[in-house]
Amino acid sequence: GGLAVVAGVGSAAWDRLFAGPRPAELHPFRALDGDRHQAPATPGDLLFHIRAATMDLCWELGSLIVGRLAGAATVVDEVQGFKYFDERDLLGFVDGTENPSGSAAEDAVTIGAEDSAFAGGSYVIVQKYLHDMTAWDGLTVEEQERVVGRAKLSNVEMADDVKPANSHVALNTI
């Protein structure tokens, strides 16, 4: 079933659990407040990202972890995910098109020699999006494509002279 788990330790928990040095870039998330959207800081101490080909394996491992941490940790949030059609998000667009793959993906997320005590580790930020699906579904496909900056069916990115400067693609290109 391809069972895998990634464990993460939050900034405050790190200091309580470990006496030695901390990863150089480990810090609490700073809340972001924009004109229309906010990203609040909701720190946690432990994160377990569990994945498998079937949900029962995820459930079993999650239950075992929670059981082992009983009395020491309390579950404050739990999210189940699933593969949606051909790698699309719930808005109907292909997700992760620009994400690196293969060794480039590993290089993009792995701590290297710059913080040698933690080389091979990584950092994680979790974002939870709440979409107004009724409003989204009320938009025409053309309007949705302008919001995202890609063609919905073909996943082709709009040309720069057509793509709105405030589209998802324009604002989230690193």
List each language-model region with its residue ranges.
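Long, histidine/aromatic-enriched segments associated with O2/redox biology
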Residues: G1-I174
